[in-house]
């Protein structure tokens, strides 16, 4: 609550009004109220097409509740706007209908206050659907004034810090978060309909594994051990495949102690899925289905627009090997066998920076990221990643330098990552050991050896296809949001000084 010494004039007046309510026997912060219409949209859907004459004749009485965000009129009659989670609806208050005492209470109330309204549905001469109040109930006092209704919150920092004010003043933002929930429901429905079981795995882990990322570290006092916030759910979910669950998915929060930009937040939602007897081609089909389900929430024809570019999810997504993509863009042919020295020379000649510990596969991946990725517009599967950057993916049978892995790219950004999963425990141990060596050579994001996971693989894991989808990025895409912060209700922020 605001320090009494720092109250502005409006806040002082509102506190005086709060006390006046108490003096009149009116609770400034009420208890339960029972509207018979949950949403203003219910009223609009039911009565919008009725004529004013018909509505007057029917005398349809409703009870609604919400925040007053506008008030107009003088004398003994006023109009006001009520905001609930369905949107805005107008109500009309007359002293001779609600009584002098109630009308005085209404006139003295402020924008931001909550009211319950009972009355009949009418249309004004301008044709606006309106609830004509027969009874009004004061529900809750707002002690701070709302932002200007015409301009809302202008400071992006305040939008993210005070999301509640953004939701009140920016209907587009409010509806974006409603759409987010609908998209997640549609994705879950698709997974459930295709025989996947939703599961939950630990957020606190003894070892940070499943991705190349820097973890958050915490301490468990009772066990007196350091633990890690999970950076992926992969290895837990694959243990469940070993256990016979066959098709599983988890949609939940991941934590990575890394940088922040319009596409990255330290905590974010992903969905990982694993299906026994799938290979990465099957997972491509699954991925298409997931994105079509999401696009269907916002566009019946599965064609959406993101930042001015139309994207078509109605057709099959293009598929292209990473090496072929590089060759198309640069003319360089990485299908040819080469030494790391030869690869480094190609990198030097083309302005590609590299680390001292990089192998040929790392340089191939860097060429793709630097020369190809930003050119990819429509949904496309890039497959065949080098072994060096895919420690958990199955080696391709035809060329052991590459893996049966793909990523989905749209408008130059990665939206999904998938493999034919590595199920050979001996190969898996070798790759973990190679990652440990990279860590020793300076790659602080390389994965440690997860002995328990290797042991699980030794009991046998069937051929499996796995997928990871960034849910926040997907929602950004489908709702035309510029930043990941626009689809997270409470994004990570530096504390206010």
From Swiss-Prot:
InterPro entries: Aa-tRNA-synt_II, aa-tRNA-synth_II, aa-tRNA-synth_II/BPL/LPL, Lys-tRNA-ligase_II, Lys-tRNA-ligase_II_N, Lys-tRNA-synth_II_C, NA-bd_OB-fold, NA-bd_OB_tRNA
PROSITE patterns reported for this sequence: AA_TRNA_LIGASE_II
Entry keywords, A to Z: Aminoacyl-tRNA synthetase, ATP-binding, Cytoplasm, Ligase, Magnesium, Metal-binding, Nucleotide-binding, Protein biosynthesis
Domain of life: Bacteria
Entry's cofactor comment: Binds 3 Mg(2+) ions per subunit.
The keyword Lipid metabolism appears for this protein: no
Cellular component per GO, a single term: cytosol
Cofactor(s) needed for function: Mg(2+)
SUPFAM superfamilies: Class II aaRS and biotin synthetases (SSF55681), Nucleic acid-binding proteins (SSF50249)
Lipid metabolism in keyword set: no
EC numbers, comma separated: 6.1.1.6
Catalysis: reaction(s): tRNA(Lys) + L-lysine + ATP = L-lysyl-tRNA(Lys) + AMP + diphosphate
UniProt-annotated location(s): Cytoplasm
GO biological process: lysyl-tRNA aminoacylation
Binding residues for Mg(2+) 1: 407, 414
Listed name of the protein: Lysine--tRNA ligase
Gene name of this polypeptide: lysS
């Amino acid at each position: 609550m605001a320090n009494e010494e720092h109250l502005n004039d409006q806040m002082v007046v509102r506190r005086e009004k709060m006390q006046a309510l108490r003096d009149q026997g009116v609770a400034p912060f009420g208890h339960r109220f029972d509207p018979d219409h949950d949403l203003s949209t219910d009223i609009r859907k039911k009565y919008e097409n009725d004529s004013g004459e018909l509505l007057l004749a029917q005398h349809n009485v409703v009870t609604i509740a919400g925040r007053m965000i506008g008030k107009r009129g003088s004398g003994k009659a006023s109009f006001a706007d009520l905001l609930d989670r369905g949107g805005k609806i107008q109500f009309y208050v007359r002293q001779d209908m609600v009584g002098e005492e109630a009308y005085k209470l209404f006139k003295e109330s402020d924008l931001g206050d909550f009211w319950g309204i009972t009355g009949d549905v009418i249309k004004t001469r301008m044709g606006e659907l309106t609830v004509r109040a027969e009874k009004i109930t004061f529900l809750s006092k707002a002690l701070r004034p709302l932002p200007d209704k015409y301009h809302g919150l202008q400071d992006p920092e305040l939008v993210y810090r005070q999301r509640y004010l953004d939701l009140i003043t920016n209907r587009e933002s409010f509806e974006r978060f409603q759409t987010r929930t609908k998209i997640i429901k549609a994705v879950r429905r698709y997974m459930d309909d295709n025989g996947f079981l939703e599961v939950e795995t630990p957020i606190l882990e003894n070892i940070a594994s499943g991705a190349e990322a820097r973890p958050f570290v915490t301490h468990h006092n009772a066990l007196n051990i350091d633990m890690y916030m999970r950076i992926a759910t992969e290895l837990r979910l694959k243990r469940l495949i070993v256990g016979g669950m066959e098709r599983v998915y988890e949609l939940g929060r991941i934590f990575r102690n890394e940088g922040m930009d319009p596409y990255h937040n330290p905590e974010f939602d992903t969905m990982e899925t694993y299906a026994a007897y799938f290979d990465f081609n099957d997972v491509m089909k699954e991925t298409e289905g997931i994105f079509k389900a999401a696009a269907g929430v916002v566009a019946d024809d599965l064609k959406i627009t993101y930042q001015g570019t139309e994207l078509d999810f109605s057709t099959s997504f293009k598929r292209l090997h990473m090496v072929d993509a590089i060759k198309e863009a640069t003319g360089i042919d990485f299908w040819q066998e080469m030494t790391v020295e030869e690869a480094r020379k190609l990198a030097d000649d083309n302005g590609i920076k590299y680390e001292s510990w990089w192998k040929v596969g790392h340089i191939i991946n860097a060429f793709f990221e630097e020369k190809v990725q930003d050119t990819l517009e429509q949904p496309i599967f890039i497959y065949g990643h080098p072994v060096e950057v895919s420690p958990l993916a199955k080696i391709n049978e035809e060329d052991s330098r590459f893996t049966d892995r793909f990523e989905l790219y749209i408008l130059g950004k990665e939206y999904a990552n998938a493999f034919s999963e590595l199920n050979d425990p001996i190969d898996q141990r070798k790759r973990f050991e190679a990652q440990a060596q990279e860590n020793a050579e300076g790659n602080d994001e390389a994965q440690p050896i997860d002995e328990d996971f290797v042991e699980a693989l030794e009991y046998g894991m069937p051929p499996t296809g796995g997928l990871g989808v960034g849910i926040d990025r997907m929602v950004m895409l489908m709702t035309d949001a510029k930043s990941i912060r626009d689809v997270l209700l409470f994004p990570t922020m530096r504390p206010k000084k």
